[in-house]
Amino acid sequence: ADLPTRQALSDIQIESARVSRTVHNAMLLYRLENGEPCELQPFDVSELLEKAERMAPDIEKSLEIQLMTEREGVGRCVVMGAPDEAEQLLLHLISNALCACDPGGRVWVSLKQRKTGAVLRVEDDGCGLMEEDPIENNRRFLSGAKLGLRICRLICRRAGWKLTLTARPGGGTRAQVAFPLASGEAIPPEMVLHSGEGEAIRAARFASRAAQEILLLRRY
């Protein structure tokens, strides 16, 4: 195909991804705001860091932004929540950090284990926070969709997690989520937290959403 045709096809792909993301976020926000029941289950929060690690090569290639991960004292760390929503939370936080950065910028995703739970941090060296309270004023998330921060807050609220946004020392923003351990982590090591089939489906869904987000950020 000639250049104008390729450009038109690319524009269609991007707009389709944008509509799909907006619909997905709006539906999720509706479910969260209307208190639709959600079965909380034990899951290994360290899996979030592994998903961030898999995103890094595509992010650097497409956006020229480095995404670095770090785990400190974290092995298997079981918390209560909805794994799908935890992954959505991670994707929103990473996307916002990427949106704040220029090419050549850096994003850090770290997970630290504490006696009472785990702490996930997503930090960037981008433009930093607005002077207003970002949680109260719906800081722009996900390339201006204005849904992401409220989604993150509601996900954390119903799972019993704590979300905070602060200025990062040296510039940029730090988003932090504190996960309390599931019932003192009184779960036997041999317990299967989720089925292999369910994990495979969730992994594929997360990969698709991550690719979609990177595509949209590339045109932001």
Predicted segments, located by residue:
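Conserved micro-motifs of the catalytic ATP-binding
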Residues: 34-39, 76-81
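Short beta-strand/loop element within the Bergerat-fold HATPase_c
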Residues: 104-116
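Acidic ATP/Mg2+-coordinating residue in the GHKL
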Residues: 124
